[in-house]
Regions:
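Conserved PLP-binding catalytic core of the aspartate aminotransferase-like
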Residues: 140-193, 197, 212-214
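Alpha-helical scaffolding segments of alpha/beta enzyme cores, especially the outer helices
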Residues: 1-8, 12, 143, 147, ...
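Active-site PLP attachment segment
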Residues: 35-90
Length: 249
């Protein structure tokens, strides 16, 4: 999707523009000022190299004072770190607790105690991600996904037309033979079989979703294509044998 164009149209129409960047943040160049989004959220367990159970969100400063948090907790309040709330500077409510929110997006943070294990893991993942040249990463991954596309077409797969990112590709059954044989259920069986061979992909919306990373090599890609070719060949041959048996019967 052309996020920059969408952002421009949202601005013209005074529409709040929210982007789920989980599939791209950390490996694809994405600038909130360029796309003019108001909210950019991402789970850290994919391209941000973090653990499951943590997410990050950017919120445009224009909403910091007017948006109220979903979670009402002490860490979003002024002077929450003080030993006693009576030492807080600001509005103390009738219950004896400060009611003023802290400045900035921190007022919108989720509740609960800070996780002393997961948050340092998130920080380390972000440190590594910051060192990655996103442009160079896309060029390298585009080489891999272009080869996956070319090899997939030789087997009978194709991709949706239009521009695409370099780090994800979806191979769809394209030939009439594969379209008739590779039902969604059978595609899941193929994915499970490939997993046993150390080849990992996912079935999403009628396509094999393949997402190489920076440690993926061209040899890995060739192994993927060979394994996929063998699996599809086995299905085609099995179907031919079954048809022959029916004809003989």
């Amino acid at each position: 999707m052309d996020l920059k164009r969408i952002g421009e149209e949202c601005k013209k129409r005074d529409i709040i523009f929210v982007v789920d960047g989980t599939q791209s943040v950390g490996i694809f160049p994405l600038n909130v000022k360029e796309i003019q989004c108001h909210v950019l959220a991402a789970s850290v367990h994919k391209w941000l190299l973090g653990p499951h159970g943590q997410s990050l969100v950017y919120i445009d400063p224009c909403f910091h004072k007017c948006w109220l948090p979903l979670d009402q907790h002490e860490r979003s309040r002024v002077a929450f770190q003080n030993e006693v709330y009576d030492a807080a500077e600001g509005n103390i409510g009738p219950s004896g607790y400060p009611e003023d929110f802290v400045a900035g997006a921190a007022r919108l943070d989720s509740g609960g105690k800070k996780n002393p294990i997961l948050l340092p893991m998130v920080c380390e993942g972000l440190r590594i991600v910051r060192e990655i040249n996103k442009g160079s990463a896309q060029e390298y991954l585009k080489l891999l996904t272009n080869r996956i596309l070319a090899g997939g077409e030789e087997i009978g797969f194709g991709v949706q037309p239009g521009p695409r990112v370099g780090h994800i590709i979806g191979l769809r059954p394209q030939s009439s033979e594969l379209r008739s044989l590779l039902t969604p259920e059978r595609m899941v069986e193929v994915a499970d079989s490939l997993k046993c061979k150390g080849v990992f992909l996912a079935v999403r919306c009628g396509a094999f979703r393949i997402a190489p990373y920076l440690d993926t090599t061209m040899e890995d890609v060739e192994r993927l294509l060979q394994a996929l070719k063998e699996e599809c060949g086995s299905i085609i041959n099995w179907e031919k044998i079954q048809n022959c048996k029916k004809n003989i019967a």
